[in-house]
Amino acid sequence: MAERVVLAYSGGLDTSVGIGWLKDATGKEVVALAVDVGQGGEDMEVIRQRALDCGAVEAVVVDAKDEFADDYIVPALKANALYQKRYPLVSGLSRPLIAKHLARVAHELGANSVAHGCTGKGNDQVRFEAAVAALAPDLTSIAPVRDLALTRDKAIVYANEHDLPIEQSKKSPYSIDKNVWGRAVETGFLEDPWNGPIEDLYEYTQDPDVLREATEVTITFEAGVPVAIDGIRYSPLRIVQELNAAAGAHGIGRIDVVEDRLVGIKSREVYEAPAAMTLIEAHEELEALTIERDLGRYKRGVEKDWANLVYDGLWFSGLKRSLDAFIEDSQRHVSGDIRMTLRGGRAVVTGRRSETSLYDFDLATYDTGDTFDQSLSKGFIELWSLPSKISARRDLAVEQAALAADDATPAAAPAAE
C-alpha cells in the first residue's frame, strides 16, 4: 500500500492543485480533509466531491462548528482574547482545531504525514505544524506552497493543464480566511497601509455610516459562557451566529490594523468580527461587575499572554493549559445580563446586572441611605500612604546631607601664576 498524506483542504485553487502536486512530488496518495468551522460559502458535500475529482483517494468532511464554538471560541471569550489589543484571533483559533482533525484522520487512515496550503511567510504554517507536532510527533508536515515551489501562477497553469474542476479566478487579489468567529482579508491593494479599505471588501458587516434603527440586545452569561440572547437560550454557536447577523447589520466589528507576525514582519490586515467584538465587550463589562479589582488587574496580563500564545501557534502548550486553568477559575462568578445598543459601528453597554455582583448600591450611593463609613477613610489613607511618606523623609534627609557636605567643602585655592 502506498504511503498517504492527509491534506487540509479548503476547496480553493491552491489546495485543489495541491492534491496532484503532492502526489507528483512525493509519490504519496492524498487524502483530503475539509473541516467546517462555519466559514459558509459552498456546500461541504460539493467541496468533498471536488477533492475526489482533483485526485484525492479519499475525502473526509468534518462538521466542527459546535466544537469550534464550545472548545475554542468560548475559551477565547473568557480570555477576552485580542492580539495586540485589536485582533480577535479569527484564524489563530481555527488552526489548532483543524490540525487536531488532521492528526486524528492521519492516524485513523494510516498516513505518515499531513499537509497544508500555507505560504512560508505567514503565521498559519507555524500554527498547523506546531499543533501537529504537539499532538502527533510521529507525523511529518508538508507545505506544497512553501516546500514544493507551488506558486499561484504555477497552480493556475497546472489546473488548466489537468482540467481541474475549480474556478481559477484572478479577479480577486485578496487572500481571505473566514469562520464563524470572523473574516480576515489581506494582500492586494491592502498591502500599502496608506490605502483605505473599500466597501466591496466586506462581507460580514454593513456600512456603519449608513445609520439604521438601533438594535437592543441583552446577552446572558453563566460562568463566563454566553447562554442566551433576550432571554432565549442558545448554544454558543447559535449565539455567535445570531450576533454576527445583528451586530454585522450595524457595521460592528470592522478592524483595520498593522500587526506583528510571528515570522518577524509586519502585515496589514482587515478583519470583520461582529459577534466577537460584541461578545468581548459584553464579557469585559460583566467581569467589571463581578470580579475583584486585583483579580481583574492580574487577569489583563494573563489575557495578553494567552492571546500571544494562541497567535503564535502554541494552543497545545503547557503554559497555555496553565493559563486556561487560571482563567477558568476566574469565571466562577461571571454570570449575569449585559444590555447593549447596536448602532453605527458600535456595541454600547447600557445596562448590567448579576446575582453575583460586587457592586453594592448602598455603599456606592451618595444619597440618603449611604452605608459607607467615610470616617474610616482618613485612617486608611494614613496607612496607605505611609510607605511613601517614610521614603520621602529618607530621600529628603539624604538630599539635605549631600547639600551640607557640599557647603562644608572648602573652595580650592587659585592656582599660582
From Swiss-Prot:
It catalyses: L-citrulline + L-aspartate + ATP = 2-(N(omega)-L-arginino)succinate + AMP + diphosphate + H(+). ATP binds at residues 8-16, 117. It is found in: Cytoplasm. One of its GO terms (molecular function) is argininosuccinate synthase activity. Keywords: Amino-acid biosynthesis, Arginine biosynthesis, ATP-binding, Cytoplasm, Ligase, Nucleotide-binding. CDD domains: ASS. Pfam families: Arginosuc_syn_C, Arginosuc_synth. InterPro entries: Arginosuc_syn_C, Arginosuc_syn_N, Arginosuc_synth, Arginosuc_synth_CS, Arginosuc_synth_type_1_subfam, AS_cat/multimer_dom_body, Rossmann-like_a/b/a_fold. L-aspartate binds at residues 119, 123-124. Pathway: Amino-acid biosynthesis; L-arginine biosynthesis; L-arginine from L-ornithine and carbamoyl phosphate: step 2/3. Its EC number is 6.3.4.5. GO terms for cellular component: cytoplasm. Homotetramer. Belongs to the argininosuccinate synthase family. Type 1 subfamily. This is Argininosuccinate synthase.
